[in-house]
């Protein structure tokens, strides 16, 4: 029995070492090199330069590194999910803007990023908040935990209770440990090398990134994403809407939103709500599957705006806003041209 064990060990150990070394060295998702990778990106952005050729990275940790490198508070901070990540300095001429949008962003992201800005003394004079059903509905991503220390610090400050050092660092450690010997990650690493992909980001100065970030934090999507097959997008939007629906309203998330608004308004920070439209086929499918749910969310945002004297821009219905189907990257994201139209008509 002992001999068999030793033979198995002789076979397994080299394979395990090969997997671990490959995963660590190639690291296509920047699981092990996240700090160095993100720090380099933030350093370029802090110079007022744009950065290109970005691969997988933790967008929340990038926000932290960007804010840490700010020399002064921005005039405007844009908070929300990826649906607002193209709203930048060109929307507000003459003002400094920091886009703090993150993919799959929820209310806890807004709280954590506000806690980050406050902790580092970089609260802006104005905040633009992108609100939608996924922001204040049930469920959502746990990605906000990358900034859990700031989330906990913020709640401790406003509630005067709880743990100010609230931290969920263990999931990050667990992810690193599991990825070290993961065969799936090994496969991704081999595929990354075989396709000759590169993790080398580029400082393009004032040039337009093909797939990266502008110096104000806004995203530069690749051409293939900005110019999709519109028929396929429409088909996918309808199918997904009928299949998945929208999350139901969440009283806890709505409560957090109100606590956040209290904090901002007590500090006389100007607030503006933004609702960006969904693809018309997705909107129609949701109304068929969950009648009046979109209407509920839009009414909630508008009434909250009236109650708190906060202006509201946009809406969820693309047709009512005059946004054509051709101005959607996918079912969730309208184009920058559509965003410009929404802001322009709101300001007139």
Predicted regions and their residues:
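Hydrophobic membrane-insertion alpha-helices, especially the h-region
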Residues: 6-25
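Alpha-helical transmembrane signal-anchor/signal-peptide segments
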Residues: 25-43
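Short extracytoplasmic
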Residues: 42-72
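Secreted/periplasmic serine-hydrolase-like ester/acetyl group-modifying domain
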Residues: 144-267
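Active-site segments of SGNH/GDSL-like serine hydrolases
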Residues: 263-289
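C-terminal regions of proteins
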Residues: 289-348
């Amino acid at each position: 029995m002992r001999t068999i064990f030793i033979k198995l060990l002789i076979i397994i150990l080299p394979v395990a070492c090969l997997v671990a070394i490959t995963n660590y060295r190639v690291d296509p998702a920047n699981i092990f090199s996240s700090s160095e990778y993100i720090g380099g990106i933030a350093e370029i952005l802090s110079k007022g330069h744009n950065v290109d050729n970005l691969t997988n990275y933790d967008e929340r940790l990038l926000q932290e590194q960007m804010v840490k490198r700010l020399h002064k508070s921005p005039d405007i901070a844009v908070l929300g999910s990826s649906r607002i990540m193209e709203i930048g300095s060109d929307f507000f001429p003459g003002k400094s803007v920091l886009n703090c949008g993150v993919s799959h962003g929820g209310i806890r992201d807004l709280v954590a990023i506000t806690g980050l800005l406050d902790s580092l003394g970089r609260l802006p004079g104005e905040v633009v908040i992108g609100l939608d059903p996924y922001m204040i509905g049930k469920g959502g991503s746990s990605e906000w935990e990358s900034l859990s220390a700031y989330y906990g610090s913020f709640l401790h400050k406003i509630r005067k209770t709880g743990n100010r050092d609230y931290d969920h660092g263990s999931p990050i450690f667990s992810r690193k440990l599991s990825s070290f010997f993961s065969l799936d990650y090994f496969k991704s690493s081999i595929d990354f090398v075989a396709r000759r992909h590169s993790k080398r980001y580029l400082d393009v100065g004032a040039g337009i990134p093909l797939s990266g970030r502008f110096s104000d934090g806004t995203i530069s999507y690749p051409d293939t994403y900005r110019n999709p097959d519109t028929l396929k997008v429409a088909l996918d939007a309808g199918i997904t809407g009928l299949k998945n629906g929208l999350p139901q309203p969440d009283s806890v998330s709505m409560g957090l939103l109100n606590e956040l608004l209290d904090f901002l308004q007590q500090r006389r920070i100007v607030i503006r709500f933004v609702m960006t439209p969904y693809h018309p086929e997705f909107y129609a499918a949701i109304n068929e599957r969950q009648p009046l749910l979109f209407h509920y969310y839009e009414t909630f945002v508008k009434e909250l705006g009236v109650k708190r004297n906060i202006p509201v821009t946009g809406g969820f219905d693309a047709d009512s806003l005059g946004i054509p189907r051709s101005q959607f990257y996918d079912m969730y994201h309208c184009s920058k041209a559509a965003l410009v139209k929404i802001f322009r008509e709101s300001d007139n």
